[in-house]
Amino acid sequence: MAAHISNAASDATNGPQKTFDISALPKSNNFTRKLPPDEEYPTPATSHAAERKLLGPRLVKNAAYTFVRPDAMKSSELVGVSKAALRDLAIDPTTIDSEDFKRTVSGEKIITLPDEDGTPEDTAVYPWAQCYGGYQFGQWAGQLGDGRAISLFETTNPSTGERYEIQLKGAGKTPYSRFADGRAVVRSSIREFVVSEALHALHIPTTRALSLTLGPEEKVRREMMEPGAIVARFAQSWLRIGTFDLARSRGDRVLIRKLADYVGEEVFPGWESLPAKPPSYDEAAVVDLPRGVPKDDVQGSAENEENRYTRLYREIVRRNAKMVAHWQAYAFTNGVLNTDNTSIYGLSIDFGPFAFLDNFDPNYTPNHDDHMLRYCYKNQPSIIWWNLVRLAEAFGELIGAGARCDDKKFVEDGVEKDFVDELVKRAENLIEKTGEEYRAVFMAEYKRLMTARLGLRQSKQSDFDELYSELLDTLEAFELDFNHTFRKLSSINTDEIDTDEKRKEVAGIFFHHEGLSKTVGSEADARARIAKWLEKWRGRVLEDWSDSANAHEERVTAMKSVNPNFIPRSWILDELIDRVEKKGEREILDRIMEMTLAPFNDSWGWDSAEEERLCGDVPRYQRAMQCSCSS
């Protein structure tokens, strides 16, 4: 199995760190210790003693989770492990062939129990599934929850201090499975395994994937019978907006407060870590906010009175604004941005019909069920804000309470009649202002990323219209590839485009191999428009850099470090799935993961022709592919 670890890592480390085999990994269960359990199975022992089939679908109230053990597949084969994930979790890569590792990530062993046949103690670290709800395509869907994902334990990397929750997706039924079977199929599991690590390698906030285990004998019914699989994945938190949605829909203000306190104290590094009230909502003013406000301090007065819950909401909003800015800058489309798929921590989460754009098309959606284009590329920033407003509805009482959020009567009895108008007015005002902050943070982050992708050292006010918008309009008009454009731009020397004739000649490198589509106009028009844009870009490059050879080399290096050579596009993932699932190949998964974990490389040293094919032009009839939510 050691061959199935990529030799690439996504980030540099500061020397060696202490690593562990999975059994010795430091483990905790803050989530289950500090939040209320399912009353039907309130302890690990009660759940462990129950027949596995009794732990299936039902309504769960007044709880954040249910204790439930994985339901192992009939047989398993560990086919992929991310070295970057091993490093970040402090797992010794030489131990992945051990039975402990393989049986843990396949759901066959509860690694936290010394005796699986015995009775676990009440304080034992025992697997659980989270309870949440959500708005799906804008409509309330009721109780959802981890219908096939089961968290095993939390672990803190001793070198970084980062805590992660490790979870198995496809590990069997839970009380939140509804009408589903608790399983995941190979095709969706391969897609999630690859894209989780791809986004991380591109520095896009995301949940992660540790391993991929196939279940050759596990037959799962979807549109047809398919083999099953389990992805071991991890994140700083798996809490979603939908976690709060469900409590709000049930009027459970006690659980909302418990969840909010847990996020402020456990998910983030404490109340003092949260961002203070901004001096204004201009882009420049919101980029870096001071932190360190004491937990009980209230900033502002009257309808602008901000307590710690407002600061908590601000942190969640800012993280999601930055996340979606990364999506837009790298043309990643999630495909299903329901509130149960929107992270409190600001992570890309729950990968279904996702895709990276090929040709730039702002109306593209990778989800063939999204007929109204609700979740298309251009709508992602507004949809994330729509979801955050749903979170604000859950937080509204806590935000609106201002300085009275800890008053005994408010905490125990709720909002008194004579306080309602003041509370509502304050909440509406602060949520509206946080919306302004969301837009400002998004734009500031988007401009920062696009400035870097264009090889500029600083952003000018005119860049947005003259460079960013004009480039995107040109790509859309002539059906050109988004990410390839930036990579090709990276290597252009300003001397190569110092005349209009040269610029028109260079413009051809952005065309597809087959040339321009007949529906987009003439090649001469395309060359002229691209040349005009290149002239503006060249001028800005020379403003920020000198025209020396050294400056050119520095700029090329800087641009190649942010403009990927390889992205796991839909056509590549489809081919990968076919070769792994249908043809039984294994090496190709290793190769794709090597490229995925080092996407900015010029080459990876295995097969130059194959690397060129995978990094090159997308086959004409495999552009803008769509898929379903079925997984």
Predicted regions and their residues:
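Hydrophobic residue at the +6 position relative to the catalytic HRD Asp in the kinase catalytic loop
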Residues: 335-344
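Short, flexible segments with low predicted structural confidence
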Residues: 56-59, 170-171, 298, 363
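Conserved ATP-binding subdomain of kinase catalytic cores across diverse folds
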Residues: 71, 75-79, 83-294, 345-347, ...
